[in-house]
UniProtKB/Swiss-Prot annotation:
Signal peptide: none
Family listed: Belongs to the universal ribosomal protein uS14 family.
One GO molecular-function entry: rRNA binding
Swiss-Prot/TrEMBL GO biological process terms: translation
Subunit structure, as described in the record: Part of the 30S ribosomal subunit.
Database matches in HAMAP family: Ribosomal_uS14_1
Name the record gives this protein: Small ribosomal subunit protein uS14c
Organism superkingdom: Eukaryota
Amino acid sequence: MAKKSLIQREKKRQKLEQKYHLIRQSLKKKIRSKVSSLSLSEKTKMREKLQSLPRNSAPTRLHRRCFLTGRPRANYRDFGLSGHVLREMVYECLLPGATRSSW
């Protein structure tokens, strides 16, 4: 089980990412736009605005965690579980349709 503080930190990052998502997206779109007639100084101002946003609001700072244990590694997107928990649940027949492989 992961520390509760780490799980809360990840939830805080998710909230920040949702809050600043549209702002970050619009600034990036304006900077990357080839059609816009922005001068170099205007683009640098937009980059500074982008850099002034909180670091934890960037989507690259997010990390998937198992929703049962909070484990940050070996997560399966389809289930939202880490590999360890997924394996145990399959063995106990708690996931419908999932079976152990045998050949």
